[in-house]
Curated annotation (Swiss-Prot):
The gene is yhaM. Belongs to the UPF0597 family. Pfam families: SDH_alpha. This is UPF0597 protein YhaM. GO terms for molecular function: L-cysteine desulfhydrase activity. GO terms for biological process: L-cysteine catabolic process to pyruvate.
Length: 436
């Protein structure tokens, strides 16, 4: 019914959010390899006996130190094994959601027997690349994912090529919902959020439900670095104030703790990342509760947060040396500012201050310490909002911040796309030397 009230640009915004904001169980880089392994295993009739896998340096970086849900183990080999033995390829980023205890035990046994090998794909021109080749007797199947965590581009078996993606991705990108973001602005996004029918964006409330549940789990259990629960204890000791700023810090940290610690609960992801989804969601939820927002106001604030985060991240490589919790928190800053005064200038100033504050934070792979960066980014977002509410912000006379927010965003993203590529290589070299 509401479709007739929505212009094509708004429809593209909605589709972009639906495309980029999805449930994901487990860190999405090892999950991408698990999906490749599951899809390959689905092509075979017999039991998988051995797995060879190849990944890009960036995917290796983000898969080396993170816990795979339900296994208590870290790394890409267990993800590949569990994907092949217990994964559901049709479930996308939730490929491991129905993996049984037996599948986990069998996957661990496969690793112990030395039947899983994960190697760097060399040479590799793709930032996000995962390939799994699984064997059953004399049969084998190989699945390749490129560009996005679930983008299967080729399926091949010992009998021949089953599927190959058409090579027209660049042309399709220009007219896709995400491609449209290259030709829009934050002002247009804000106008959309203010006027779009509530029923058209009600679905975004699922982000609050899923990421809110992760936050509660993080406070209940001892997940990851248990930053959220530790800070909550310090509140009880009188070492932290029990105020709105602390609530944002604790509840956002707790969700990331659970996520990175291997809790078997899905996150609502953003731009292929659970932590980005958490960062774009939980701070906005906390402020919405504080101001007594109803479901419609919460949905509009979450839509602004997630769409702003996607808008910024779309100008970045899918994976890079820049910690994207920072850009997701820029979306959160927009959502929180909207809840309080709704002014474009407040939103723009908050994002500019964020760029002047945390834009140098590096991504050194997915791990429990991501929760530290998530909490830092969420705190910086709230600080930037408080400054903006008093008409104070980092100005265009300082650093990489420009005189308008769109140029500030462009400046930040150009760093990640160009000069930080060398930083990324250095990070991967350091991490690889530790592995040996």
């Amino acid at each position: 019914m509401f479709e007739s009230k929505i212009n094509p640009l708004w429809q593209s915004f909605i589709l972009a959010v639906q495309e980029e904001v999805k449930p994901a169980l487990g860190c999405t880089e090892p999950i991408s390899l698990a999906l490749a392994a599951a899809a390959a295993a689905a092509e075979l009739n017999g039991t998988v006996e051995r797995i060879d896998a190849w990944v890009s340096p960036n995917l290796m970086k983000n898969g080396m130190g993170v816990t795979v849900p339900g296994t208590g183990m870290v790394g890409l080999p267990i993800a590949a094994a569990l994907g092949a033995l217990g994964g559901d390829a049709k479930a996308g980023l939730e490929v491991l959601k129905d993996a049984s205890a037996k599948a986990v035990a069998d996957a661990k046994a496969m690793l112990a027997a030395g039947h899983v090998a994960v190697m760097l794909q060399e040479p590799c021109n793709d930032i996000l690349f995962s390939r799994a080749k699984v064997y059953s007797g004399d049969s084998w199947a190989c699945v390749t994912i490129v560009g996005d965590h679930t983008n299967i581009v080729r399926i091949e078996t010992d009998k021949g090529v089953v599927f190959t993606q058409a090579d027209n991705a660049q042309e399709e990108e220009k007219t896709s919902p995400l491609g449209v973001l290259s030709h829009t602005s934050l002002e247009e996004i804000l106008a959309f959020v203010n006027a779009v029918p509530f029923d058209a964006i009600r679905f975004i409330l699922d982000a609050a439900r899923l990421n809110g549940a992760l936050s509660q789990e993080g406070l209940r259990g001892s997940w990851g670095l248990h930053i959220g629960s530790t800070l909550a204890k310090q509140c009880d000791r009188g070492l932290l104030a029990k105020d709105l700023s602390t609530a944002i810090l604790i509840r956002t940290s707790a969700a990331s703790d659970a996520r990175m610690g291997g809790a078997t609960l899905p996150a609502m992801s953003n731009s292929g990342s659970g932590n980005q989804g958490i960062t774009a969601t939980v701070p906005v939820m906390v402020v919405a509760e504080h101001v007594g927002a109803d479901d419609e106001r919460l949905a509009r604030a979450l839509m602004l947060s997630h769409l702003s985060a996607i808008y910024i991240h779309h100008q970045l490589p899918r994976l890079s040396a820049l910690c994207a919790a920072t850009t997701a928190a820029m979306g959160a800053a927009a959502g929180m500012a909207w809840l309080i005064d709704g002014r474009y200038d407040t939103i723009a100033m908050a994002i500019s201050s964020m760029i002047g504050d945390v834009s140098g934070m590096i991504c050194d792979g997915a791990s429990n310490s991501c929760a530290m960066k998530v909490s830092t980014s969420a705190s910086a977002a709230w600080k930037a909002v408080l400054m903006a509410l008093d008409d104070t912000a980092v100005t265009g006379n300082e650093g990489i911040v420009a005189h308008n927010v769109e140029q500030s965003i462009s400046n930040l993203c150009s760093l990640a796309c160009r000069s930080m590529q060398q930083t990324d290589k250095q990070i991967i070299e350091i991490m690889a030397s530790k592995a040996h």
